[in-house]
A protein has these predicted regions:
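Intrinsic low-complexity, repeat-rich intrinsically disordered segments enriched
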Residues: 1-112, 123
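Beta-strand signatures of extracellular beta-sandwich domains
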Residues: 62, 186-190
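Terminal (often C-terminal
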Residues: 82-163
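A short beta-strand element within beta-rich, extracytoplasmic domains
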Residues: 165-179
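Extended, low-complexity, turn-rich repeat/linker tracts enriched in Gly/Pro/Ser/Thr and Asp/Glu
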Residues: 175-185, 195-198, 248-252
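Extracellular carbohydrate recognition and processing domains
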Residues: 203-229
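Noncatalytic modules at the cell exterior or secretory-pathway interfaces
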Residues: 229-248
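C-terminal interaction-tip segments
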Residues: 245-264
Length: 264
């Protein structure tokens, strides 16, 4: 609508102002309102631009290209900032756990073994991967002791120490066997409370994600899994571990697990 040839009484509701008693813009931030007093989400001063909605939504700020694709998006409902045509969360990061068939050569059937985080190495070679029991899920606690699969020096390479609060967005894995006969395999991702300087090293285990059982037919093919995320939020100072289990020992396995997450 144009204001041309209109009376002020006909257009005043469409005029935005700083609600500053006719003193103009100052150093004090003021909410922008329309002529009848309705408030906007915009606040303004001579040095500050501030947005604060009356109700949270998924599109507080949108920057789009000429085709209408979102290039920048502020989501105040979920407290996220996204960018790019794919609307990716801007602080998205990735973490990796892995093992190879050489390390897996000492795995026992139906036992949960923790996998190395990042590019960590083992002080005790293939005897070092910590084991977390034979239950349906890995054990929710872990005690360190001298011996294969229980040393603190073997636990450290499999722990991801979370420095900030994070949210897990997705987990994917690849696995491959080293003989023509495979097994049924399964994997889990857990968080734990870590106690420094104690043999009661891990407690309060929580299932974060898991994959569906893989009926692995052997070394002729590799398998990809897209996991179910069971509990997405992990608080700072927790540790995260990934586990692999096979129901038999027909093959040894190479495994690569990728965790997609963002800071929160």
């Amino acid at each position: 609508m144009s204001f041309t040839d209109k009376k002020l009484s006909d257009v005043y509701k469409d005029i935005l102002h700083t609600d500053n008693s006719n003193t103009g813009i100052s150093s004090t931030i003021k909410q922008i309102k329309c002529g009848d007093g309705d408030a906007t989400a915009l606040y303004l001063s001579d040095s500050v631009l501030h947005l604060r909605p009356s109700t949270d939504g998924t599109g507080l700020i949108r920057v789009r290209d000429a085709d209408g694709n979102n290039l920048f998006l502020v989501d105040s409902t979920n407290d996220l900032v996204k960018a790019g045509v794919g609307s990716h969360i801007v602080n998205t990061q990735y973490a990796q756990f892995s093992t190879n068939s050489g390390e897996g050569a000492v795995f026992s059937a139906n036992t949960h073994y923790a996998l190395t985080f990042g590019h960590a190495n083992f002080s005790n070679g293939i005897t070092g991967l910590p084991s977390f029991g034979t239950g349906t899920d890995p054990a929710t606690s872990f005690t360190t002791a001298e011996g294969n699969h229980t040393r603190s020096g073997d636990l450290v390479p499999v722990m991801w120490l979370v420095s900030d609060n994070i949210t897990i967005d997705a987990v994917y894995s690849l696995e491959g066997a080293d003989t023509a006969t495979g097994d049924t395999t399964r994997m889990h991702l857990f968080s734990y409370t870590f106690t420094s300087g104690s043999t009661s090293a891990l407690a309060d285990g929580t299932l974060l994600a898991h994959n569906s059982d893989v009926t692995n037919a052997g070394s002729e093919q590799a398998y990809k899994s897209t996991w179910t995320v069971d509990s997405a939020n992990v608080d700072a100072n927790k540790v995260i571990l990934a586990f692999f289990e096979a129901d038999s020992v027909n093959s040894d396995y190479s495994v690569n697990i990728r965790v997609k997450y963002h800071l929160r």
